[in-house]
Amino acid sequence: MGSIGMTELLLIFGIIVLLFGAKKLPEIGRGLGEGIRSFKSAISGEEKKEDEKVVTPKEIEAEVIKKEKVKENA
């Protein structure tokens, strides 16, 4: 109970064909695929942003001081 069997899937597919027609099915599938693809890329984009290192102001200040000391010694 609760799982969808092969007969239920065929029935759902038949209803979709009746509602939209056979000519519209490739367009619907293409649109659905593009939507899923863009959703996945948006999610992976957020993960990439989280992986990037966050630089704090203290780290920036320390780097500037380090460069100034190098200039003074040169």
UniProtKB/Swiss-Prot annotation:
GO molecular-function term, one example from the UniProt record: protein transmembrane transporter activity
Main location: membrane
UniProt keyword list: Cell inner membrane, Cell membrane, Membrane, Protein transport, Translocation, Transmembrane, Transmembrane helix, Transport
InterPro entries: TatA/B/E (IPR003369), TatA/E (IPR006312)
KW tRNA processing (keyword) present: no
Hydrolase in keyword set: no
Compartments reported by the entry: Cell inner membrane
Transmembrane segments: 1-21
Membrane topology: Single-pass membrane protein
GO biological process: protein transport by the Tat complex
Gene Ontology cellular component terms for the protein in this record: TAT protein transport complex
Function per UniProt: Part of the twin-arginine translocation (Tat) system that transports large folded proteins containing a characteristic twin-arginine motif in their signal peptide across membranes. TatA could form the protein-conducting channel of the Tat system.
Quaternary data: Forms a complex with TatC.
Similarity comment: family membership: Belongs to the TatA/E family.
Protein name (Swiss-Prot/TrEMBL): Sec-independent protein translocase protein TatA
Native source species: Sulfurihydrogenibium sp. (strain YO3AOP1)
